[in-house]
Amino acid sequence: MEIEILNTHKNDFSPVIGERTMELLSRFGQKLDEDGIDTLSSETIEILSHCTNPYKNEVQSVTNLVVGYVQSGKTMSFTTLSALAHDNGFRIIIYFAGTKNNLLSQTTKRLRKDLINGSANSAYYKLFENPTLEYAQRIRNALNISSKPTILITVLKHHKYISDLAAMFNSMQLKQTLGKAGVLIIDDEADQASLNGYAYKNSKSEEWEDDEYTTTYSSIMKLKGALANHSYIQYTATPQGPLLISIMDLLSPKHHTVLTPGKTYTGGKTFFCDEPGLIITIPEGEVFHSKHNNLADCPDSLVNALQLHLMGVAIIVKLLQKESFLSMMIHADRDQDASEKFYRWIKNIIDAWSNILANGEQDLGYQELKDSFAKCYPESIRMYEAHNESAPSFEDIWCCIDDIILDTNVELVISRNKRQGENKEIDWASSCSHILVGADMLNRGFTVEHLAVTSVSYTHLTLPTKL
């Protein structure tokens, strides 16, 4: 095996904000205030300044780490990084977009929406998803366009697709054309699947020739080896893995940047430290477990959570008109049978409530249903009272419930759901209320927009896995 010593990266690259970054930031200004835009700009410049110089015609590489809280804007960060990379001469950006097809699709659509912006920026960016060797000529042609567009490549974090990508960059069509031009590799959720799972075992071996490597890690090494001038940027909310691996590992970061969450961000600190009252504990007997507590009927705690969600929609969407929709997420167990069971429960409850409300007060179940919602009313407004804010009356909320139930979209998000498929996109704007029931496809990285209520069954047997 031949070992090539790459030039160590020197901090002689000073990126500047150009037209594409300014245009993107102006659109992000609809979501962020002036301080938020300034923070996003400065942190993005810092990240790119530690990357290799795309204009240096030499073999070079570096690995850097970007740490951000869960759902705190990491995607916005690497989207802005992409625009800044374009403005500063990077020709190709590769995104490891998760281990599930729905995550790949989500990232591809976000990049198309935010960077290409319909067709407004199609001259500046060319987007490819999971390209193989057959794409080599198309990407070569794109690299030769006189306007020098940046090639955006999203790829599933799986050894087959990454190996295919490495083969494409090693092809005769691309290798000479790309040369030593700057390439970014953005690894989303970098601590998941990318690192070598045999690292600890290898550390006990006396001979490095006997080291073993996981398939995804090996494919990443192939890809890095195919790119003469590249920067590998790890994005994660859980950086322990990248930080604790051997500093000799090529995925060990040399620099790190900690992202600043927005002013309105709420995360673990909010829920578990500042506002612990936002957490409601499910009674032990109602905690689902596929082997040890396989519930036959929908537990009362889930019914109450559903009622709180619907009442939240009434308050936030219908009465206060602060948002156009709210979402609820339900995760029972990794077993897909459990997700299907919970989905049936929710659908049946929603349909039953809709029928009762359609019949009106003459329905024998009408008053009982209204009373059950009334019991949840104090919980639905508790945080308003805690912060000395006025809250709508129960009667005002109840008047909205019928329409909200009729406009509630319930989705089963599992891989074997043939009707939906892994790449089904949630049409968030279509309903005022969304309920997503799922297992691993609702794992980290998947964005549930306007999430207001989460119902998750934890036992001492499943807590470490789910966290």
Predicted regions: what they are:
Residues 447-457:
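A short beta-strand element within the Helicase C-terminal
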Residues 33-64:
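Conserved pre-motif I regulatory segment
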Residues 108, 120-121, 126, 182-185, ...:
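Conserved C-terminal RecA-like helicase domain
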Residues 134-181, 201, 215-219:
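Conserved RecA-like ASCE ATPase "motif II neighborhood" in helicase/translocase motors
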Residues 181-182, 198-316:
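Conserved P-loop NTPase catalytic core
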Residues 92-112:
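Conserved Walker A/P-loop ATP-binding site and its immediately adjacent core
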Residues 77:
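Hydrophobic positions on the alpha1 helix immediately C-terminal to the Walker A/P-loop
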Residues 459-467:
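Conserved small/polar residues in nucleotide/adenosyl-binding loops
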